[in-house]
Amino acid sequence: PEVIGRMARQEKLCPQFHLSLQSGCGATLRRMNRHYTPAEYEEIVENLRSAFPDCAITTDVMVGFAGETEEEFGESLAFVRKIGLAKAHVFAYSQRPGTRAWGMEGQVSRREKERRSALMIQAAKEGQQAFLRGQLGREEAVLFEQQKAPGVWEGYTRNYTHVLLE
């Protein structure tokens, strides 16, 4: 909270925060050797939203990590839906030689990872659509970066909402 408070006092800060989640399930995070819990992640998000009411929270979510059960995946999916993200990069775990997870039991099949990816991507899209609906009708400063087509300019708001202007 102290660091977030200092950030909130900065005039030149764009309120878009990328916080890598990896999984919304505590058991999966422990197997990944991550040193945070979903509850701690949620608390950080709540603190950011309190300090920056219109901030965008983006993340990375992995599906199909070694040993991820259907129940654990369900927890992660529910967490992503609950937290409400502006955007999420969803990817499937891929086994890599020499890593700790290489020899772990419970490797998830390619087909199952594809199924889980599709479900997680859909949840992420729903969160993104809800975030974007909240931006509609707002008057915002936009940094236009390029002309996309004749008469069409492309840029971003302070919270990294993509804007096209004709």
Question: How should these model regions be labeled?
Answer:
Residues 103-166:
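Terminal RNA-binding accessory module
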Residues 1-87, 93-112:
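Conserved non-cysteine loop/helix-boundary elements of the Radical SAM core domain that shape
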